[in-house]
Amino acid sequence: MKPLSSPLQQYWQTVVERLPEPLAEESLSAQAKSVLTFSDFVQDSVIAHPEWLTELESQPPQADEWQHYAAWLQEALCNVSDEAGLMRELRLFRRRIMVRIAWAQTLALVTEESILQQLSYLAETLIVAARDWLYDACCREWGTPCNAQGEAQPLLILGMGKLGGGELNFSSDIDLIFAWPEHGCTQGGRRELDNAQFFTRMGQRLIKVLDQPTQDGFVYRVDMRLRPFGESGPLVLSFAALEDYYQEQGRDWERYAMVKARIMGDSEGVYANELRAMLRPFVFRRYIDFSVIQSLRNMKGMIAREVRRRGLTDNIKLGAGGIREIEFIVQVFQLIRGGREPSLQSRSLLPTLSAIAELHLLSENDAEQLRVAYLFLRRLENLLQSINDEQTQTLPSDELNRARLAWAMDFADWPQLTGALTAHMTNVRRVFNELIGDDESETQEESLSEQWRELWQDALQEDDTTPVLAHLSEDDRKQVLTLIADFRKELDKRTIGPRGRQVLDHLMPHLLSDVCAREDAAVTLSRITALLVGIVTRTTYLELLSEFPAALKHLISLCAASPMIASQLARYPLLLDELLDPNTLYQPTATDAYRDELRQYLLRVPEDDEEQQLEALRQFKQAQLLRIAAADIAGTLPVMKVSDHLTWLAEAMIDAVVQQAWVQMVARYGKPNHLNEREGRGFAVVGYGKLGGWELGYSSDLDLIFLHDCPMDAMTDGEREIDGRQFYLRLAQRIMHLFSTRTSSGILYEVDARLRPSGAAGMLVTSAEAFADYQKNEAWTWEHQALVRARVVYGDPQLTAHFDAVRREIMTLPREGKTLQTEVREMREKMRAHLGNKHRDRFDIKADEGGITDIEFITQYLVLRYAHEKPKLTRWSDNVRILELLAQNDIMEEQEAMALTRAYTTLRDELHHLALQELPGHVSEDCFTAERELVRASWQKWLVEE
């Protein structure tokens, strides 16, 4: 045995001072002194358990002792009665055996291949023992999971990565995938669980038993992220679910990972053979598959970027010529030719490397250089980790640990060790570059593009730095990285084929480049990723955004400006087609052309296909709404025009809905026979409120009432004859149904018909005579106020003229000023008590004092008060033109009318913009103080003082 170097002999004196009495210096062998000097982990362990050192001295580690691990552990567990005891014994056993492995490794008592085998089998032994103990415990608690035939179902565990390959390093995570064979339920328990529940609960307990730190440490850090759908997927999957996933969605990196997958424990059972046979076609293709080279090149590029980004210098695993590159070289041949060459299907690297040489896929010299380099690097890695049982592959910077490694690797000093290391890594790098290729030199533009790809593909952590986000604040940068990470997790839950992922990988760097250049990058990205989640399984939409950069830019600018638009696009991705043509996107349909446009749009849908008709109506409305909002955001539509467009659009929809309902009712019952004596349909739709006043907002509902002029004795003329008035009732019900039916494109409009005579208690459709009688003899003042903002939005000329005459007659009735003033004011106070002042320190733009409703009440009061003297006041139903009429007819001073108009349009404009932001209609208390003061003064003047 090589004597300790001078620095290590000096350090031995420090070790001596730590040793307890049973471990006196004179009682220790030279081997013990060497190992205790080299490894703080061994030192701490034998100080806590001196008997372990005695055992090591009397029974030194052997190369084949891994064959006894299972029996030794079973003996340790035989008296364990609870989970806490299980956790304790597993941790102590792991530590005891790791001390033996560290001893053998430090003194080179066994080969490096034996060390890797012992480390891997120790992990497998601990995992299987924990699984079997917990399976028995869970079966006692919940019953035994069985398939439909009553056969017990086991939990199979795939060990991935180095664990699967039998090449585990000294201090390592373990990558696992859990699976069970067939669906069914537990039998014999206190209550029945389905197998998915049983194995999920058991899997959670198994992870806890292995992973949770206690005063005895942990067994292994467990990583389950290699399972289908990653962290967002089920913890345990049935064989059928595994097969579906890998057949439909398995990605190249998952093939790469699955090469090393090994079933832990009994790997020759029926279910183990079934699982292996199921996975083999996914991993090893029957044809020679050269596409894998580019996939591995991409993965290596990601790793290289991570090394640069995280400053991982001196990393013997990830650095150029490191362990990972040897693994890549070997797996290139496995993935390209493994389906044809069974000798390449080994999970372990060294046997596969020998097979590669025998098949003359690499020269004997290259294969030998890789073998020697691999064993050198793995010994160096394991020695490095065994110093403190620490998961690291970065060479130390301190003198003590450098001296330790130089001595254990059998070099005189650190420079000699690093010289040999450099030679090995240079050999590896040469073979890697010849086989897989290195990144070619990039232009500045290509480098920038690469950085955006890195941002998308490399799953950066919050504390990672990347130059493309340097202009953002720290909070925004972290938020952007979190959004990207969350989006990627969400993608793992979705069924996205290879083509979809390919398109996404092309689209996302461009999208991130455009979004992250904005100051509001985080907010915009949050809206767009929410939208993308809804369309990732529909490759056509991804291709649209990928292939039409202008459409992508429009999408970004609209989503940045309005979460309402982002939500609409997310709910109804068909609207993405609208982004293709900026000429139509930012130019809404002419106000008088909506009916014609809709008629043309509906021609593409069969008249007898009601479902498609409903969808078409909704899709047309959403597309037009998007155009109006886009023009609003672009500033090409002032507030009055926005409402005009929204109102004309609603009228076109009403027209089409009545037409559809009419056709359906006539086909069923025929037409009411009184129509034989007159033109038209004898039916009208009256719009109240915002619709009647040309003041619709983006999310306004429609206040409608339905009128007819059908005589009492009229009947329909169809084969299924019904009463004429019954026909109009069913027509109105059908209209309500067409508006409110929820399809995949949502509803058309919320419709409120409670303003009809007698409200919700009244008939849904009213005869024109009954309506007139009600307004004259029963209606309340507030119903006459509502009539000020009412107009026919659909109807034949005869009924329209009748309604207009009734409206004019009611509004021009002489009214006693004080009584009217009191009734209007009291109604407003009731509304304010019910709707206003709900938000402390906020101003509700519509409902609070000085807001929009006050202006509406002022105009309604003045029309009802003075229309009997000035009948022209009844001409218009919208507030702005009523204010003009009040000024023109010398009821209100022009200056006041103009000021109220400005206040009204300003407040309405703010409501539109809040709707675009999906924000409620209230603002800070100190907003719009001038407008509110003006409205209060006008209210005082007309409704209090007069």
From Swiss-Prot:
Positions of region (Linker): 441-448
Keyword tRNA processing: no
Record key words, sorted: ATP-binding, Magnesium, Multifunctional enzyme, Nucleotide-binding, Nucleotidyltransferase, Transferase
Note on cofactor: Can also use Mn(2+).
Annotated segments matching region Adenylyl transferase: 449-946
Activity regulation (record text): The adenylation activity is stimulated by glutamine and PII (GlnB), and inhibited by 2-oxoglutarate. Deadenylation activity is stimulated by PII-UMP (GlnB-UMP) and 2-oxoglutarate, and inhibited by glutamine.
Pfam families with a match to the protein in the record: GlnD_UR_UTase (PF08335), GlnE (PF03710)
An example molecular function term from Gene Ontology annotations: magnesium ion binding
GO cellular component assignments: cytosol
GO terms of biological process kind: regulation of glutamine family amino acid metabolic process; regulation of L-glutamine biosynthetic process
Record carries keyword Magnesium: yes
Superkingdom assignment: Bacteria
CDD domains for this protein: NT_GlnE_GlnD_like (cd05401)
The protein's required cofactors: Mg(2+)
UniProt-annotated stretches for the region Adenylyl removase: 1-440
Activity response to pH changes: Optimum pH is between 7.3 and 7.6. The enzyme is stable between pH 4 and 9.
Reactions accelerated catalytically: [glutamine synthetase]-O(4)-(5'-adenylyl)-L-tyrosine + phosphate = [glutamine synthetase]-L-tyrosine + ADP; [glutamine synthetase]-L-tyrosine + ATP = [glutamine synthetase]-O(4)-(5'-adenylyl)-L-tyrosine + diphosphate
EC number(s) from the headed UniProt entry: 2.7.7.89, 2.7.7.42
Family note: Belongs to the GlnE family.
PANTHER family: BIFUNCTIONAL GLUTAMINE SYNTHETASE ADENYLYLTRANSFERASE_ADENYLYL-REMOVING ENZYME, GLUTAMINE SYNTHETASE ADENYLYLTRANSFERASE
Subunit details: Monomer.
Protein purpose: Involved in the regulation of glutamine synthetase GlnA, a key enzyme in the process to assimilate ammonia. When cellular nitrogen levels are high, the C-terminal adenylyl transferase inactivates GlnA by covalent transfer of an adenylyl group from ATP to 'Tyr-398' of GlnA, thus reducing its activity. Conversely, when nitrogen levels are low, the N-terminal adenylyl removase (AR) activates GlnA by removing the adenylyl group by phosphorolysis, increasing its activity. The regulatory region of GlnE binds the signal transduction protein PII (GlnB) which indicates the nitrogen status of the cell.
Protein known as: Bifunctional glutamine synthetase adenylyltransferase/adenylyl-removing enzyme
